[in-house]
Curated annotation (Swiss-Prot):
<feature type="domain" description="HECT">
    <location>
        <begin position="488"/>
        <end position="821"/>
    </location>
</feature>
<dbReference type="GO" id="GO:2000232">
    <property type="term" value="P:regulation of rRNA processing"/>
</dbReference>
<comment type="similarity">
    <text>Belongs to the RSP5/NEDD4 family.</text>
</comment>
<dbReference type="GO" id="GO:0005634">
    <property type="term" value="C:nucleus"/>
</dbReference>
<feature type="domain" description="WW 2">
    <location>
        <begin position="339"/>
        <end position="372"/>
    </location>
</feature>
<dbReference type="GO" id="GO:0043130">
    <property type="term" value="F:ubiquitin binding"/>
</dbReference>
<dbReference type="GO" id="GO:0032956">
    <property type="term" value="P:regulation of actin cytoskeleton organization"/>
</dbReference>
<dbReference type="GO" id="GO:2000203">
    <property type="term" value="P:regulation of ribosomal large subunit export from nucleus"/>
</dbReference>
<feature type="active site" description="Glycyl thioester intermediate">
    <location>
        <position position="789"/>
    </location>
</feature>
<dbReference type="GO" id="GO:0070086">
    <property type="term" value="P:ubiquitin-dependent endocytosis"/>
</dbReference>
<feature type="compositionally biased region" description="Polar residues">
    <location>
        <begin position="297"/>
        <end position="306"/>
    </location>
</feature>
<dbReference type="GO" id="GO:0034605">
    <property type="term" value="P:cellular response to heat"/>
</dbReference>
<keyword id="KW-0963">Cytoplasm</keyword>
<dbReference type="GO" id="GO:0035091">
    <property type="term" value="F:phosphatidylinositol binding"/>
</dbReference>
<feature type="compositionally biased region" description="Polar residues">
    <location>
        <begin position="151"/>
        <end position="173"/>
    </location>
</feature>
<feature type="compositionally biased region" description="Basic and acidic residues">
    <location>
        <begin position="281"/>
        <end position="296"/>
    </location>
</feature>
<dbReference type="GO" id="GO:0045944">
    <property type="term" value="P:positive regulation of transcription by RNA polymerase II"/>
</dbReference>
Amino acid sequence: MGSNLPAQPNLRVTIIAADGLYKRDVFRFPDPFAVATVGGEQTHTTSVIKKTLNPYWNEMFDLRVNEDSILAIQIFDQKKFKKKDQGFLGVINVRIGDVIDLQMGGDEMLTRDLKKSNDNLVVHGKLIINLSTNLSTPIPNQANGLHRSHAQSSTSSGLVPQVSSASHPSVSPGQAEPSAAASNVSLHPQRVPSTTRPTSTVGPVNGGPAPPPNGPQGSRTNLSSFEDSQGRLPAGWERREDNLGRTYYVDHNTRTTTWTRPSSNYNEQTQRTQREANMQLERRAHQSRMLPEDRTGANSPNLQESPQPQPQQAHTPPAGGSASAVSMMATGATTAGTGELPPGWEQRTTPEGRPYFVDHNTRTTTWVDPRRQQYIRMYGHNANGGNTTIQQQPVSQLGPLPSGWEMRLTNTARVYFVDHNTKTTTWDDPRLPSSLDQGVPQYKRDFRRKLIYFRSQPALRIMSGQCHVKVRRNNIFEDSYAEIMRQSASDLKKRLMIKFDGEDGLDYGGLSREFFFLLSHEMFNPFYCLFEYSAHDNYTLQINPHSGVNPEHLNYFKFIGRVVGLAIFHRRFLDSFFIGAFYKMMLRKKVSLQDMEGVDEDLHRNLAWTLENDIEGIIELTFSVDDEKFGERTTIDLKPGGRDIPVTNENKGEYVELVTEWKIVKRVEEQFNAFMSGFNELIPADLVNVFDERELELLIGGIADIDVDDWKKHTDYRGYQEQDEVIQNFWKIVRTWDAEQKSRLLQFTTGTSRIPVNGFKDLQGSDGPRRFTIEKSGDPIALPKSHTCFNRLDLPPYKTHDVLEHKLSIAVEETLGFGQE
């Protein structure tokens, strides 16, 4: 046939792309390349596209053909090219005369289904090619393409060069240049070398729902990052992909990112207005967050002091009038005293004119008028099924305080008690039945007691003096870095006084709350490459393993650790939430396979499959993993000599543990240690370890006020209908629960207590928008189960309201860890 071929090439073949290739390996995507052959004499090979089922080559080859020539294009996986099946992924065979007239000339675009070979391996997907008789334009320089003989293709497959699937465009420094108040190193991605993959830099910050991830992909188009299939992006915008292949958009004008493509009629003012509206919603939600200790509203933005009693500032509450029981329960105040003092009591006045009372019976003094009535709040269920009961009892009839105890008032006239024996304070009167009685769920008793113990420790006491931090709102990250890193840890433990440049206002709590709210939005912004959004959704965070793109990244992680510690120390909340494994790492707990769900849901599923099935002869693995940074791919041994140790049924448990440890901990160990070094300067490790990982999330982020109506409105049902008795009982129970119980239910079912800024309608799962779902599943004697990656609750058909509440409470309150399945 070769003698009938023309002397010069007469057909240009462009191998454009393949789509939907078969994934043979449980744990890895293939590294596809294509081999084009005519008559066994002319062979051309494309470049290798790493880790994708949808490779895009767009590479051209000129061939000598006649109408009877058969063009065969085979696709192989480079990883398996030396194995028996050569990593075969499919083939197409095209008779040239059937698709194009070589005499008349022409240009034909073909999309053909991939076919099996003789060994009958499973194949699916399509191949897109172009045939053209126009050879007048030279083939562009294909630096990555290989033109080799058939012998070279079959014997030197290991030499196929590794190709970065995408390149990072240079960014004009003027597009996102900050003022570097903290250091001379820019925080922004324009310093990234031009070879950096966009998947290793940033992820979305806010905006609309995420498109479903398609897995790691190679470059699918030769479009620049400033345009896409719909045309050029507005000025200052850039298109990128995260590490899961999800497309997002970077607005260099405002240093923000979003999942939503900017419209062609993009208006910066409209976008700014929308961002400000969202910020206000988030601010209100953030300021309403609280902890069990602060139920009385001590964390309200309107108060001028933190809930920690400040005895030296206490004063006598206003006399006269009375309040309702509900009001008194909310404030902890007492009614005004009238009539004569009880026997043995005397009223005196300090040199400053402040009245106090002497109890000659016990030889003690107090600021509290013994004639006043105190409303005592006790937890537990009353006869009507309520959550609290109110008792009214004269203080004078309670008898003396236990030895070493003292009663005091806050500056808002709320009674609290000092235990000088343990140097702790509490709102609970030690003479009364404890509000932490046996009727309270175990988790609530433990969390409140832990909080009281934690905040009473000497290391958590505010030191004398003030710590002044002055920042500009529009430069809060850099200014905060400079201010907080220049001060010693002991200075940061003084009373925090925040000052916003150009604004009047004294910090009695409101400014510091605003400071931590704004700073948490900025420093956790994936735009800076320090953190990225998890595989679970687009609002929980994890450390970016490629943060080294910023040479100063370890200093910034230490700074962020200080900020988190500073917020806990001064009883403020951050508007940021991390994956469950991050909290476990903070507590120095060992991570488990369940924690992998929030990091890499596909890998979690594959590792779980490996543990549950026989892998002999099915999966070929070694104790090593492939890692890719900035286009450079390396093999990392999970144990000494791991790349030469095969994984078997006997050692697969160890393999899963080592992969989990590497994926979650080892990849970011350097950054995490820097974070913890800053955190532990303010919060000692032995103190924070009293909490579990779910409690630590609440300690850092607070407890949200959850709108049950909005939650119910955006819930789907499988096997149930909204009118079913079980569903009606479920929502009745949720409505009776307090904010802490609701937050724990949210943690149990979604993996985090965070609610999207626009409510439950924007709830995200591992594969994009995912509404909260209740599925009819399980035996009525079993506990409910959750699937946090899919925001799903498996709820058995319990017969009665009481059984449902009991089972749900046990599942929510006693389950440890984030991975419920």
